[in-house]
Design a protein with these regions (language model features):
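Bacterial Sec-dependent N-terminal signal peptides
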Residues: 1-24
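Selective for proline/serine-rich intrinsically disordered segments
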Residues: 4, 83, 111-112, 132, ...
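Residue-level detector of intrinsically disordered/flexible regions characterized by low predicted structural confidence
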Residues: 4-7, 119, 308, 538
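Conserved short hydrophobic patches within well-ordered secondary structure
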Residues: 4-6, 80, 169, 311, ...
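Extracytoplasmic soluble-region selector
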Residues: 22-291
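Feature marking well-ordered beta-strand scaffolds used for ligand recognition
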Residues: 205-207, 264-660
Length: 660
């Protein structure tokens, strides 16, 4: 074992992985039921009380916000500043004697400012009788905030339209009608020009009559008038009903406004296109995808005295296969393994550094350099460690680099002799390692937003995929040339985010079967926090975003495993290998167009549970990551170490269904 410095264990750990006191003390604070206006500030004051309402000593009370961009909180002073309206959570943590932590979440409401105006828009300017009118409503507040989830009071100037209790507006008779929306005393109106429905009949066709669950049908509908002339701008809508072949199941699927349909469950489906009261239907069959294969555990490399973090498998300069794995919340140890025989994973060397957590490990493409991250260093310098792994049986530390990385490094990536290292969960720095003994910082990337945060960065083809929690994924040119960026001048050129704000990792891939370019965005959610000694509850899923049009990314599909949350993953050859924390390692078919809920569609090929009775936390699966390497699926498990598994060969497809 190599040791870079003596280890002094501190009770330092990131908030998302804290261990909390289980006694009956509680935090009482003046931010209970706090209500603020936008731009208003308030200073929190909190004490800790026991069951008898006596104040209990608290060495330090710290605060943080679940949404720092909208509600900024000074961790030390407790000053809270409201930047955006809505409901938010402020977490108060009392650090007690012996390092015990007591926590309480407080809800803070930030009022919306006065309404400035209401905007009403037509989604489609062609309005026919006997049709619902597609409208969008926005409330625009002072200070520029926009909201579209309020209940308006809608009225009409005449009886040419009807308005139901859910504010759906239907065209009844041809002519002009004025629709008025009112909210908080502010009104806005729009004139609706309604025409008599000219559609006589609709011709509905599809690219296939039968396909598997998960395969996408394309329906095309053409509207004609009484003279058999095409009505090109007819507002055609699509819908479906279905009946499962399995009487104990319920048919389900998804249909888009452009006529694409996917069935989740095998059954018979009726697809309908309509313009007002004129419709056409077509019956299709959806059969089982039938892609299950045996997925077997091959070998394990047990770590039973501490938690395991990330890992990386690589080919050494000697042509043999090796792996490196980090450890979490322990003593800063990194392990090296010989995995040439996947059924016999052999621990061959280790390095111990001044850290509690070595969260991430990466190896250069030539198999010569390993970079590991540090968090919880006793001297608070943290940073990265650069290691010579030309002989994995006898690895040697080359250098450490801490400049601008003292707040802790959670993830790293090596690309073309540059290390991209996260700094304190806020930004990443680019460090040149042409001379690994003398690493040099040459660039950095940050969003430049209040409360900016980042969890991961992944690089392919000169593009860095920066995973920024609430701000989603940023595509950053670090040498690709698409935005004239470079390692010393990273330039963001595309972005996508989603409502949960839990975006933790990104994996880009181009579909081999369709040519479409996707980024797969993963959540990381622990609804009840982390239990370092027992079973955990995890949540979240993978979001599939079609980035073929960089200016208009579209979220098209998800992989969500009921009851288990996502973590790290790998894609190769239209197959996904994903560690679903408590749900184990899952293998998922990504062939063809992707649309809807991939799990419901039966796209899962197989899975293993990675827990072990000899683990640090016995019989408790907590799969951390997966990597396909030379035909085997390697993985790490937070509780048990590393392992390998293998899929049986693909069986010939005997189904007759196909999408033409």
């Amino acid at each position: 074992m190599k040791i870079i410095k003596p280890i002094i264990l501190l009770f330092i750990i990131t908030f998302s992985f804290e261990s909390y006191s289980q006694d009956n003390n509680r935090i009482v604070s003046n931010i209970q039921d706090l209500v603020l206006d936008v731009d208003e500030s308030f200073t929190a004051s909190s004490v800790t009380m026991d069951d008898n309402d006596n104040e209990v000593s608290c060495n330090n009370m710290i605060y943080y916000s679940r949404n720092r961009e909208a509600l900024d909180v000074n961790n030390e002073t407790g000053e809270i500043t409201a930047n955006s309206p809505g409901f938010f959570t402020v977490v108060a943590i009392c650090i007690q004697e012996g390092g015990k932590r007591l926590r309480k979440d407080f809800s803070v409401k930030v009022n919306y400012p006065p309404v400035n105006k209401i905007k009403i828009s037509l989604i489609n300017n062609v309005l026919y009788t006997d049709s619902y009118i597609p409208l969008t409503f926005e409330v625009i507040y002072e200070k520029g905030f926009i909201r579209n989830d309020v209940k308006f009071n809608l009225t009409s100037s005449n009886d040419l339209i009807s308005i139901d209790n859910l504010n759906n507006v239907k065209a009844i008779t041809s002519g002009k009608s004025t629709l008025t929306a009112e909210f908080e005393g502010i009104t806005s109106s729009i004139i609706l020009n309604i025409k008599k429905n000219p559609v006589s009949y609709i011709e509905l066709k599809s690219n296939s009559d039968e396909a598997r669950t998960g395969d996408v049908f394309q329906f095309r509908a053409v509207a004609y008038d009484k003279k058999n002339l095409v009505i090109g701008d007819a507002p055609i809508k699509f819908s479906f009903t279905g009946k499962s072949f399995d009487k104990s199941n319920t048919a389900s699927g998804l249909i888009e406004k452009d006529g694409r349909f996917v069935g989740d469950v095998a059954g018979q489906y009726i697809i309908t296109s309509n313009v007002g009261n004129i419709s056409a239907s077509k019956i299709i069959n959806v059969i089982d995808r039938n892609i299950k294969r045996k997925f077997k555990s091959i070998g394990v490399g047990t770590v039973n005295d501490k938690h395991t973090s990330d890992f990386w498998v690589f080919e050494g300069v000697d042509g043999r296969d090796y792996a490196v794995s980090g450890t979490w919340g322990a003593d800063g140890t990194t392990y090296f393994w010989d995995v040439t025989n996947p059924s016999n994973l052999i621990k061959i060397d280790s390095v111990q550094v001044d850290a509690r957590t070595v969260n991430d490990v990466k190896v250069s493409e030539d198999g010569k350099i390993c970079v590991i991250s540090r968090e919880g260093a006793s001297n608070r310098k943290n940073g990265i460690i650069i290691i010579d792994v030309t002989n994995p049986y006898d690895v040697n530390i080359i250098s450490e680099y801490t400049q601008n990385l003292t707040g802790g490094v959670h993830n790293v990536f090596i690309y073309e002799n540059h290390v991209y290292a996260l700094s304190n969960g806020e930004k990443y720095y680019v460090i040149n390692i042409d001379d690994p003994k003398n690493p040099k910082e040459i660039g950095k990337f940050e969003l430049g937003k209040p409360g900016q945060s980042i969890h991961d960065v992944w690089i392919e083809d000169g593009i860095a995929y920066s995973s920024n929690w609430r701000n989603g994924v940023y595509l950053v040119d670090v040498g690709n040339g698409i935005a004239n960026g470079s390692p010393s001048n990273p330039v963001a050129f595309a972005n996508y985010n989603y409502a949960s704000g839990a975006h933790h990792a990104t994996f880009p891939y181009k579909s081999k079967s369709t040519g479409k370019f996707y980024t797969v965005l993963g959540d990381e959610i622990f609804p009840n926090g982390i239990d370092v000694k027992g079973q955990n509850v995890t949540a979240g899923f993978l979001h599939f975003v079609d980035f073929t049009d960089l200016d208009n990314p579209v979220e098209v599909a998800r992989y969500e495993l009921p009851g288990d949350g996502s973590h790290n993953y790998w894609i190769d050859g239209d197959v996904l290998y994903v560690a679903m924390y408590t749900g184990g390692v899952r293998v998922v078919d990504l062939s063809g167009d992707l649309m809807g809920d991939l799990y419901k569609q039966g796209r899962e090929i197989g899975y293993i549970l990675s827990g072990s009775e000899n683990a640090y936390v016995p019989n408790s699966t907590m799969s951390w990551g997966a990597q396909l390497y030379k035909g085997h699926v390697f993985y790490s498990d937070w509780n048990s170490g590393i392992g390998s598994a293998k899929l049986e060969p693909i069986k010939p497809d005997k189904t007759k269904a196909s999408i033409n």
